[in-house]
């Protein structure tokens, strides 16, 4: 199942790139096909609309280096419950190292690739307080993460957090990171 997902992704991203950069695309793949698919009026941004690639495996990181304007980590593929809080930064650091290697192997400037972490993908609890967020964001910023996506608090869900803390983070937290 995982191999098939990777195979599909490996076929999909190059096709998506063609669909967004060519006036007409014809492609016959194992999973996806397009016959004279037209892109009208085409992308306003050139060469195409940017996309970010969320992947942590070797093939996905290679695709991120080749096609993405950004890379997204959703943490350890095993899930946040399986990675102790004190080990979570090391997991992301290792992923960033593999991404850097994929960029180097593909002739891509690693620094030009935006790097994003989805909060909630690691076991840390950065939305417990302003200080917790600043520590969390500072840790990942130091590792090379450019952006952190945090979830709006949703009561009675995995995203149940204090709205007042969330608003304080938005108002004051980012300024503390520099």
Residue spans of the language-model regions?
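Active-site-adjacent structural elements that line small-molecule/cofactor binding pockets in enzymes
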Residues: 1-178
């Amino acid at each position: 199942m995982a191999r098939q997902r990777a195979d599909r992704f490996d076929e999909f991203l190059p096709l998506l790139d063609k669909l967004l950069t060519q006036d007409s695309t014809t492609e016959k793949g194992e999973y996806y096909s397009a016959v004279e698919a037209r892109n009208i009026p085409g992308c306003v941004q050139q060469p195409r609309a940017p996309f970010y690639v969320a992947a942590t495996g070797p093939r996905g990181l290679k695709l991120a280096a080749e096609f993405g304007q950004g890379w997204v980590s959703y943490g350890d593929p095993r899930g946040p419950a399986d990675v102790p809080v004190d080990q979570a930064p090391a997991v992301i650091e290792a992923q960033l190292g593999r991404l850097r290697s994929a960029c180097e192997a593909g002739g891509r400037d690693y620094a030009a690739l935006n790097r994003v972490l989805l909060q909630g993908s690691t076991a840390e609890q950065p939305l417990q307080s302003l200080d917790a967020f600043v520590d969390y964001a500072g840790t990942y910023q130091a590792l090379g993460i450019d952006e952190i996506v945090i979830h709006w608090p949703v009561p009675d869900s995995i995203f149940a957090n204090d709205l007042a803390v969330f608003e304080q983070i938005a108002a004051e937290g980012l300024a503390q990171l520099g």
